[in-house]
Regions:
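Cytochrome P450
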Residues: 1-380
């Protein structure tokens, strides 16, 4: 593809292992270079500034998801049939199948159950000499809630974390991480097809709603396996990322943890700040269906753009001192859960789980003392 000569290029691979582990210097360079930057390694236009990212996310008629939101064709093919990879009426219809499960009112009804789960998980963790924040807390809570909510059968849960991580990892460009992840993503889809074929979902669950919608011809039966995964994978990974990020940040900023302990009303905004500072979802792509200008830079019809949420959330044009973690800042407009019609459908539950975990910990844990150097996951 030929690029507009006026658009700058950034030749560093932002999906190398080192870049994945420390992406923010690269994002800062992209924002400095311009509103649109060509990435020759990925053959995409990077959108890295807050205002431009939000504008692209809100313009779902120009920047479509139906051709896939990944940076490689295999993942885009595997993602067919999901709400993530659909547009317009198709997207609205598929999202409506579970809409009643995801309203603020529906999520509020889960508060007591989530609270009870969190209390038990913290009890178990604090009985140990040392706690693995990721396994014992961040993973334990969503794993105790989401599979039952979705209706995933018990015999398929031992692989869920590996599959969910692989589903996200497969969304990157063709590199060793996405190539290794495709197997896990394909396994998850194959298992979901079996669940649909055998109708082995838990009665009264989200998965049950999906199958009933197909029975009533509201959606195609062929889309059911992908829709089962649609909520399951992201609901696990985003919440695990948010809680893990919170634990790490509060270990490094003990004064802010003390502020939360003294005033738990700060917790909802603290969760927004955690998601702003360490976005669980770093980026998704879109396809431009017409020639379009982004802040004076021309993106041609047919081009793929990479909307970098994590960069938008550190944009100095939008945030004062963006590289500082500050739970008192108004971070409600962060883009860590996306925006527009494709905003994360499960963000209400992710917020509830993360807030509840922090509330329980704030009552019972004076401080977090790292037992060693945190090992960061490498995920596209």
């Amino acid at each position: 593809m030929t690029t507009n000569v006026s658009i700058p290029q950034y030749r560093t691979d932002i999906y190398s292992t080192q870049s994945i582990l420390d992406p923010y210097p690269h994002y800062a360079t992209l924002r400095t270079l311009g509103p649109v930057v060509w990435l020759p390694h990925q053959q995409v236009f990077a959108i890295s500034r807050y205002a431009d990212c939000k504008a692209v996310l809100l313009d779902d008629e120009t920047f479509v998801s139906g051709d896939g939101v990944a940076l490689n064709p295999v993942a885009n093919r595997l993602g067919r049939g999901t709400t993530l990879n659909s547009d317009g009426d198709e997207h609205a219809t598929k999202r409506s199948v579970l809409a009643h499960r995801l309203t603020p009112k529906a999520v509020r009804k889960m508060t007591s159950a989530v609270q009870e789960k969190a209390e038990g998980i913290v009890d178990a963790a604090l009985s140990k000499q040392s706690v693995d924040g990721v396994d014992d807390l961040a993973t334990a809570l969503p794993m105790s809630i989401v599979p039952d909510l979705v209706g995933w059968p018990e015999d398929g849960r031992e692989d869920l974390l590996r599959w969910a991580g692989a589903t996200f990892d497969s969304l990157g460009p063709v590199n060793r991480h996405s190539v290794a992840a495709v197997k896990g993503a394909a396994e998850m889809l194959a298992f979901s097809r079996r669940v649909v074929r055998e109708r082995s979902v838990i009665p009264g669950s989200m998965g049950d709603d999906v199958l009933k919608a197909a029975d009533e011809n509201k959606i195609a039966k062929s889309s059911c396996p992908a829709l089962m995964i649609d909520y399951l994978g992201p609901s696990l990974d985003t919440t695990i990322g948010a809680i893990s990020g919170a634990l790490d940040l509060f270990a490094r900023h003990p004064q802010q943890w003390q502020a939360i302990r003294q005033n738990p009303d700060l917790i909802p905004n603290a969760v927004n700040e955690v998601v702003r500072y360490e976005s669980p979802i770093r980026a998704f792509s879109r396809r431009a269906v017409r020639d379009v200008e982004i802040d004076g830079s021309r993106v041609p019809k047919g081009a793929r753009v990479l909307v970098i949420y994590a960069s938008a959330n550190r944009d100095e044009r939008e945030w004062d001192n963006p590289d500082a973690f500050d739970i008192t800042r108004d971070a409600a407009r962060q883009l860590g859960f996306g925006s527009g019609v494709h905003g994360c459908a499960g963000q209400g539950l992710a917020r509830l789980e993360t807030q509840t975990m922090l509330r329980v910990l704030a009552r019972r844990v004076e401080r977090f003392v790292p037992a060693g150097t945190p090992k960061r996951a490498v995920n596209n």
